[in-house]
């Protein structure tokens, strides 16, 4: 199955994280979490650590293609409905695909998707109009030897920044 997320509004993660815009990387994990028999073939998204990801895509193998596509399409509609005001141009395509290369094991694939799904992402604390603490999953990069997730954690309070970093570290 190939999933392609594109056209989301994005923005600078330090100045626009409070706009509740969709992060395509986080949403990709939301589409794939707990899908039976999932094995990752390819996984990529975002372009800058400090930018809210506007694009992401995955090619995955699943145990039951028909059932997986049905579940993913249901989640897709949820994401698009909840983001229609903040990301009206966002698109998510889900289609059958073939892939002849290697795929990751089910366990490793599940761990990677769960990691992305649970990483802190978005506004954490705001005071009046000022963003105090936030985090952003900016880049998801599959180099075939490793999958890298780049996240940026910001805070005006050091202990809050270290807290967000500790949460992320414990997930990974």
Regions found by a protein language model. Give the residues of each.
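Redox- and metal-dependent alpha/beta enzyme cores, enriched for Fe-S-associated oxidoreductases
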Residues: 157-172
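Midchain, well-structured core segments that form catalytic/ion-binding scaffolds
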Residues: 1-154
């Amino acid at each position: 199955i190939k999933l392609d997320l594109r056209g989301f509004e994005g923005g600078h993660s330090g100045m626009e994280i409070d706009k509740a815009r969709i992060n395509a990387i986080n949403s990709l994990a939301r589409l794939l979490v707990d899908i039976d028999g999932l094995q990752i073939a390819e996984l990529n998204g975002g372009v800058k650590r400090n930018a809210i990801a506007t694009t992401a895509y995955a090619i995955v193998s699943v145990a039951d293609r028909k059932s997986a596509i049905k579940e993913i399409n249901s989640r897709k509609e949820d994401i698009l409905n909840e983001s229609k005001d903040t990301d009206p141009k966002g698109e998510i395509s889900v289609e059958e695909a073939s892939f002849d290369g290697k795929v990751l094991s089910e366990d490793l694939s599940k761990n990677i998707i769960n990691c992305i799904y649970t990483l802190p992402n978005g506004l954490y604390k705001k005071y009046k109009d000022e963003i105090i603490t936030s985090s952003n999953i900016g880049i998801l990069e599959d180099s075939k030897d490793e999958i890298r997730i780049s996240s940026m954690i910001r805070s005006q309070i050091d202990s809050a920044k270290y807290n967000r970093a500790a949460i992320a570290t414990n997930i990974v």
